[in-house]
Amino acid sequence: MRLDLKDIIHVPGASKDFQFQLDLSQLEFYGSHPISRPVEAAGTVTNHAGALELTGTARSLLDLACDRCGKEFSREKAVPLDCLLADELEDEENDEIVLLEGSEVDLDELVTTAFVLAMDTKNLCSEDCKGLCAKCGADLNLGPCGCRPEVDPRLAVL
């Protein structure tokens, strides 16, 4: 979605709201496609004395697999959108400033980038997930598996 800001660029105090859905189901993360539902983005662009500030949130329900036990689960992911918009950059190294294309901002690109950068590298069904037994593969969240714990031969004399 491209948002045209020509009606607020030169009007301090003016703002423009946006709300849209974005399909990111084609994005692959570590061999899976967790964003199977549309991402809902909503926010506001406000002109603060000539500086355009975009604030908002992008959210979706992710379909994930636990990295410890393999159990599939769903979790809502909400990503804050917060950046400044400018028609030209003075400092190329500032990642918080998004360049306008004419008087428009590409919200699809902005939301996609924010969502990709906010994705977790490790997904757990719960913080205290015990995972699977390394010997028999039993789910340790359901109870002990019955395997005898191996003693490290280097520590057996202790």
Please provide the spans of the model-predicted regions:
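Structured interface patches
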Residues: 1-157
